[in-house]
UniProtKB/Swiss-Prot annotation:
Belongs to the endoribonuclease YbeY family. HAMAP family: Endoribonucl_YbeY (MF_00009). It comes from the Bacteria. The gene is ybeY. This is Endoribonuclease YbeY. It comes from Paenarthrobacter aurescens (strain TC1). One of its GO terms (cellular component) is cytoplasm. SUPFAM superfamilies: Metalloproteases ('zincins'), catalytic domain. Keywords: Cytoplasm, Endonuclease, Hydrolase, Metal-binding, Nuclease, Ribosome biogenesis, rRNA processing, Zinc.
Length: 157
């Protein structure tokens, strides 16, 4: 399993915990152990640039996901095939503001955004109410199990 974190944000983040969480999610969703994931931590100007390039929307956002091999969650009988899951870009500065507004630690917000990004890479979405219920329910379940406590509430921009 190749999970890389590249911190270009200038903010100190517990990168090891992001990797541990990602491995946990891979195991729980039966993602192939050799699947690859890249997590890029960027500052607000870099995130705004990515947001414009990828979504044609101005302003920095919290997390962006760029899927590669269209992998989906597997099962115990049929794990996800080996491949490149994709890239997640997270802006710790935006995460810090969202965490403060929600009343939980910034690192919990970083874990929430990492989980959210991975689920997007696996094909989950929240454009429709039913999709949102499924995605956010799984997100809370995974994060609660990982943290051993209630997951932080979503802080959508």
């Amino acid at each position: 399993m190749s999970i890389e974190v590249n911190n270009e944000s200038g903010v100190v983040v517990d990168e090891a915990q992001l990797v541990t969480l990602s491995r946990f999610i891979f195991e729980r969703l039966y993602i192939h152990p050799q699947a690859e994931l890249s997590i890029l931590l960027v500052d607000e100007p870099a995130m705004e640039k990515l947001h414009i390039e990828l979504m044609d929307e101005p302003g920095a956002t919290d997390v962006l996901s760029v899927p590669m091999d269209e992998l989906t969650p597997g099962t115990p009988e049929k794990p996800t095939p080996q491949g490149m899951l994709g890239d997640i870009a997270i802006c710790p500065q935006v995460a810090e503001v969202q965490a403060r507004n929600a009343g939980h630690p910034t690192q919990d917000e970083m874990l929430l955004l990492t989980t959210h990004g991975i689920l997007h890479l696996l094909g989950f979405d929240h454009a429709e109410p039913e999709e949102k219920e499924e995605m956010f329910g799984l997100q809370r379940e995974l994060l609660s199990e990982f943290l051993g406590k209630d997951a932080p509430m979503e802080t959508m921009q």
